Design a protein with these regions (language model features):
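Peripheral, non-AAA+ core regions of ATP-driven protein-machinery
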Residues: 3-221
Length: 221
């Protein structure tokens, strides 16, 4: 296959440090030359491991990943990138560069999600604070794993799209299918199942945040 002249793509994601979020541009460049794959931009070990997860997920989703030189830059480079939430935006960026994803009006969508080797999306930690921070920074649309959809959808004024796998994301971005944006009332998220009771003791650290929540709750009684 001939390499397209447009082999650079940018997909939005977010890095979370504590409760503070930083918008990340996942830049993917694909060129001819010695086949290789590098991830730069201060990634931790789990982000570096995304190479094999993403490569296999793309292949098992039915897309051909040609032998190319692939460089993934997570910008800005001075912010440490942690966790597996960049799997989805990296995969989408590669498929944009290969022109598997052809629609151009998706640049304003933020994406987070961990990929399984079969292309399915696994739930992630920190979806709610990521979505809160994304809204503060002007993001209106987010694609994330289906399992995180409900918690994220309590945020008013945002379109939250939950996807089950990489194929579903590709079809949605190409306009082949529709994914309904979920909206959930805050009260619905407070209904706890009988099988599990949540407790602040389960939260590691964040003492000042827990104290602030306790004070806020006391003031509403």
């Amino acid at each position: 296959k001939e390499i397209s002249k447009k082999m650079l793509s940018i997909t939005k994601s977010m890095a979370l440090h504590g409760l503070e979020g930083f918008l990340i541009d996942v830049q993917v460049d694909i060129s001819s030359g010695m086949p290789s794959w590098d991830i730069v931009g201060l990634p931790d070990v789990s982000v570096k491991e995304a190479k094999e997860r993403v490569r296999t997920a793309i292949k098992n989703s039915g897309y051909e990943l040609f032998s190319r030189k692939i460089v993934v830059n997570l910008a800005p480079a001075n912010i440490k990138k942690e966790g597996s939430i960049f799997d989805l935006p990296i995969a989408v960026g590669i498929l944009k560069s290969l022109e598997v994803i052809t629609q151009n009006q998706n640049d304003d969508i933020l994406m987070i999600g961990e990929l399984s080797l079969n292309g399915s999306l696994n739930p992630i930690n920190g979806a709610l604070p990521i979505c809160i921070e994304a809204k503060k920074q002007g993001i209106k649309k987010i694609i994330l794993p289906k399992q995180n959809e409900k918690e994220a959808s309590i945020i008013a004024g945002m379109e939250i799209f939950g996807a089950s796998d990489l194929n579903e994301v590709v079809k949605y971005l190409n306009g082949d299918i529709k994914i309904e944006s979920l909206s959930t009332k805050w009260e619905d998220c407070l209904k706890l199942g009988k099988e599990k009771i949540l407790d602040f003791a389960d939260v590691k650290g964040q003492e000042s945040v827990k104290r602030a929540v306790e004070i806020a709750a006391a003031g509403r009684t």
